[in-house]
Amino acid sequence: MLGQPGQAAGDPAGVAIRRDGSFVVALSGTNQVGTGRPDSFELARVSVGRRPTGLWLAPNGARAIVTCELDDGIDVIDLGATPSATSISLGPRPELTPFDRGERLFFDASLSRNGWMSCHSCHTDGHSNGRLADTLGDGHYGNAKRVLSLLGTIDTRPWAWDGRMSTLRAQVTHSVATTMRGAPPTPRQLGDLVAFIEGLEQPAPARLSTIARQPVEVLRGQRLFGQLDCRRCHAPPLYTTPDTYDVGIGDLKANPPSLRGVSQRPRLFHDNRARSLEEVIGKFEHQLPRELTERERRDLLSFLRSL
C-alpha cells in the first residue's frame, strides 16, 4: 500500500487516521510524509525534514504536524488536494560531526535500492530487531540468521556471523551492496557511517537491581564460567574471541557474539532457537562439558545477566 516499484516507503513511522478514513503517515526512511486511503495504492507525498517520526493531526484534520528527529525541527503539513509542508526550526543547528552525518545516513533509506530499507530497519536504533534475516552476509542464501546488535561492535571484531569481515569498513560496504542492494557508499559516506557505528556504546545489563541483590551468586557464576571453559570462546573482558568455532549447528562455523549485554536479547543462537538464557543453559546445554546442578544454573545465569 505504501511503496510502489521504483518508489519505496522505507521505515514508516507515525500514522494518523482522519475522519474521512484517509491516513497520514511519516516515512522516516525517505524523509517524506504521505497521505492516502486504505482502499487505494495511490500515496501523495511531500518532502519534509530528516527522519520524520511523530505525527499529530489538527482537530479539524486539515493539517498535520510532524517531528523531524535529525533536523531539530517540525513540519506543518497542509493536507489539501496537493499536500505542502512548511518547516519550522527549533533553534540554531551546530555543525555536523562525522558521527552526526553517519547517524543521518544510518536512518536514510536512500542507501538501499529504491528506498526500501535503511540500516535502522534491521539494526533498530543501532541495536537489533531480534529477527532472522537471510542475506548474503555469509556469501549465500538459505541460512537465515539472527540480526546482530551493533551496540559496542567496535570492540568485537571480526564482523558477520562467520567472521569473514576483518574491518568494519568492509562490513558496512558489503551490507550496503548485498543486503540493501544499494550503490557503493562514497568514501565520505563510508567514513561517516563507520564513525557513527563506532560510537554506539554497549548497553548496560538489563537487571541491575537483581545484580545488586545477588553479588554472591554473580561471583560464583563468574568462577563457574571459567571452570566450564566458557572463556575459550567468550574470553573476558569483551566476552568474545576473533576466531570461528564449530558450534554443532550444521556446517556453520560461527564467530561468537559478545556476551556483554546478553540479558537484553529476547532470543539467542544464530537461528533464534533459544527463547531465553535459561533455555541456552537448561534446554540446549550449550557447549557444557557436564550437567549442571540447579544452583550452578542459577549462579551462571546471574553472572551472564551481570555482563
What are these regions (language model features)?
Residues 1-307:
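Periplasmic c-type cytochrome electron-transfer domains
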